[in-house]
Amino acid sequence: MSIRPLYDKVVVKRIEAQRTTASGIVIPDTASEKPEQGEVIATGNGRRLQDGTQVPLEVKVGDQVLFGKYAGQTVKLHGEELLVLREEDILGVVEASDAKLKKVA
């Protein structure tokens, strides 16, 4: 069973935040906040305007996105916590630059 969002809805899987600091201190689950970044795993067909035309979504499956702390609705599917939100609740798409993708020697 999978989820298929409707209209301008987007399903996002949160990307887990790092649980240790640079100095090696482990941050417990109770002290850490939910991450505000995730990967789009499903999208709707787009927003329907009053005249009946459909506007396609800007985001696509696989995009890494940023969203507000209180954005969307949390749902559980197969024991996995997902976030369903409107495209307008997405603050931006994280784009990987070539510099980050290159292996540092």
UniProtKB/Swiss-Prot annotation:
Record InterPro entries: Chaperonin_GroES (IPR020818), Chaperonin_GroES_sf (IPR037124), Chaprnonin_Cpn10_CS (IPR018369), GroES-like_sf (IPR011032)
Q: Which family does it belong to?
A: Belongs to the GroES chaperonin family.
Q: What is its main location?
A: cytoplasm
Question: PROSITE patterns this protein is in?
Answer: CHAPERONINS_CPN10
Gene label: groES
Q: Which UniProt keywords apply?
A: Chaperone, Cytoplasm
Set out the biological process GO terms recorded for this chain's protein.
chaperone cofactor-dependent protein refolding
Q: Does the keyword Cytoplasm apply?
A: yes
User: Where is it found, in Gene Ontology cellular component terms?
Assistant: cytoplasm
Oligomeric and partner information: Heptamer of 7 subunits arranged in a ring. Interacts with the chaperonin GroEL.
Query: Entry's Gene3D superfamilies?
Result: GroES chaperonin
The record's PANTHER family line, in alphabetical order, gives:
10 KDA HEAT SHOCK PROTEIN (PTHR10772), CO-CHAPERONIN GROES (PTHR10772:SF58)
Q: Which Pfam families match?
A: Cpn10
Extract the signal peptide range. Answer: none
What subcellular compartments does it reside in?
Cytoplasm
Show the GO MF annotations. Answer: ATP binding; metal ion binding; protein folding chaperone; protein-folding chaperone binding; unfolded protein binding
Q: What is this protein called?
A: Co-chaperonin GroES
- Tell me the classification of the organism that encodes this protein: Bacteria, Pseudomonadati, Pseudomonadota, Betaproteobacteria, Nitrosomonadales
